[in-house]
Curated annotation (Swiss-Prot):
UniProt protein name: Shikimate dehydrogenase (NADP(+))
Originating gene: aroE
Molecular functions per Gene Ontology: NADP binding; shikimate 3-dehydrogenase (NADP+) activity
UniProt cross-references to SUPFAM superfamilies, sorted A to Z: Aminoacid dehydrogenase-like, N-terminal domain, NAD(P)-binding Rossmann-fold domains
Family to which the UniProt record says this protein belongs: Belongs to the shikimate dehydrogenase family.
Domain of life, per lineage: Archaea
Uppermost EC category: oxidoreductase
Lineage of source species: Archaea, Methanobacteriati, Methanobacteriota, Stenosarchaea group, Halobacteria
Residues that coordinate or bind shikimate: 14-16, 61, 85, 106, 219
Pathway: Metabolic intermediate biosynthesis; chorismate biosynthesis; chorismate from D-erythrose 4-phosphate and phosphoenolpyruvate: step 4/7
Residues of the active site: 65
């Protein structure tokens, strides 16, 4: 039996175990998905220890995504983003590498969420609200897919710093957010606004329009105020569970080499969110 898992602190809230185990069960893969909660400064040691104990793959969540870079051979996109959320011990176990391979499937989660909803990103103008970890993954994902990206953040300097790292991107504060969105095709909320206060929104309703595709990274609640108001404006809306699903699907496929059973994994995830 193969063991996969998640390291983070805390991890008790994670929806990854039922999602991944639904995938293993559907395909008849003999595997389990478990959680590990090391001390906040023990990411490198924890990843090394997991590999030594025969763990086949790990997802990595806060606060370890940046520190995990020091424990892996990062894939190019993970290195550019500056964060790892998926560790594959396969090359190390096969003797083909000295360290496990590190990936960032958060970026793939963004791209595949749009693709699943038939949204073409190449040549589009995109606005990402938020310059934290989710914002970095979204900005790089959109640029990698061929979109022109503008990052908007309450602290403009953080948006500019992120934009400087993303090819062709611009960054700034929130003062001109309405004008930026007016000319955009794609909008991503990469902040946590709408999670703890469900009636809060990062984008005023009068900024939204019917030519937008709107992805909200918040997945609890599934239907945020932003998505309700975007739908009312005629926009295409994509809830955060799709992004969560497809980052997990991408990790599943890296680890197993099999096509993930997306429908089964999605059903398991949404059952947990109900």
């Amino acid at each position: 039996m193969d063991v996969y898992g998640l390291i983070g602190n805390p991890v008790g809230h994670s929806l990854s175990p039922p999602m991944h185990e639904a995938g293993y069960g559907t395909l008849g893969i003999d595997a389990r998905y478990v959680t590990f909660e090391p001390a906040p400064d023990d990411a490198v040691a924890a990843i090394g220890g997991a590999g030594a104990l025969g763990v086949a793959g790990l997802n990595v969540t806060v606060p370890f995504k940046q520190d995990a870079l020091d424990a892996v051979d990062p894939a190019p996109l993970a290195e550019r983003i500056g964060a790892v959320n998926t560790v594959d011990f396969g090359p190390l176990r096969a003797g083909d590498a000295d360290r496990p391979r590190g990936h960032n499937t958060d970026a793939a989660g963004v791209k595949r969420a749009f693709s699943h909803h038939d949204i073409e990103l190449a040549g589009r103008d995109a606005v990402v609200v938020g310059a934290g970890g989710a914002g970095r993954a979204a900005a790089f994902a959109l640029a990698d897919a061929g979109a022109t990206v503008h990052v908007a953040n309450r602290t403009a300097e953080r948006a500019v710093d992120l934009a400087d790292a993303v090819p062709g991107a611009t960054g700034g504060g929130l003062d001109d957010l309405g004008d930026r969105i007016a000319g955009a095709d794609v909008l991503v909320n990469a902040t946590s606004v709408g999670m703890d206060e469900p009636e809060a929104t990062p984008v005023p309703a009068d900024h939204l329009h019917g030519d937008l595709a709107v992805l909200d990274a918040v997945y609890a609640p599934i239907e945020t105020r932003l998505l309700r108001e975007a739908a009312a404006a005629g926009a295409t809306t994509i809830d955060g569970a799709w992004m969560l699903l497809f980052q997990g699907v991408e990790a599943f496929e890296i680890w197993t080499g099999a096509d993930a059973p997306v429908e089964a994994m999605n059903a398991a995830l949404r059952a947990e969110l109900e």
